[in-house]
Amino acid sequence: MPTFNQLVRKGRTAPKFKTASPALQSCPQKRGVCTRVYTQTPKKPNSALRKVARVRLTNGIEVTTYIPGIGHNLQEHSIVLIRGGRVKDLPGVRYHVVRGTLDSVGVANRKQGRSKYGAKRPKA
């Protein structure tokens, strides 16, 4: 326990908040160019080939982003919009590609949860 005099001299320091998505720099989304599109295998109990892309953002930072949904049209030099949100079983993947914007098309034949995958409403 500090003395009163120590508190007068130093004061209490508020705990620093560490952001989960630093490359966004407090923006909701950022635009970037795909430098590499590839698949990655998840951590131990899971098994799959997760689709990921290496993206160079407009602020110059290069990040690994997850491409959600079934099938995608992304390749090198595609312009994408990214948002925060990590993928728990892929180490180092802290961002998601926003489907249905810029060069990324929405998921085809998607009936439920369409807004998350940029899918248009199907004809009745």
Swiss-Prot record:
CDD domains: Ribosomal_S12. GO terms for cellular component: small ribosomal subunit. Part of the 30S ribosomal subunit. Contacts proteins S8 and S17. May interact with IF1 in the 30S initiation complex. The keyword Amino-acid biosynthesis does not apply. The modification 3-methylthioaspartic acid is found at residue 89. This is Small ribosomal subunit protein uS12. With S4 and S5 plays an important role in translational accuracy. SUPFAM superfamilies: Nucleic acid-binding proteins. GO terms for molecular function: rRNA binding; structural constituent of ribosome; tRNA binding. Keywords: Methylation, Ribonucleoprotein, Ribosomal protein, RNA-binding, rRNA-binding, tRNA-binding. GO terms for biological process: translation. PROSITE patterns: RIBOSOMAL_S12 (PS00055). It comes from the Bacteria. HAMAP family: Ribosomal_uS12_B. Pfam families: Ribosom_S12_S23 (PF00164). It comes from Koribacter versatilis (strain Ellin345). The keyword Endoplasmic reticulum does not apply. Belongs to the universal ribosomal protein uS12 family.
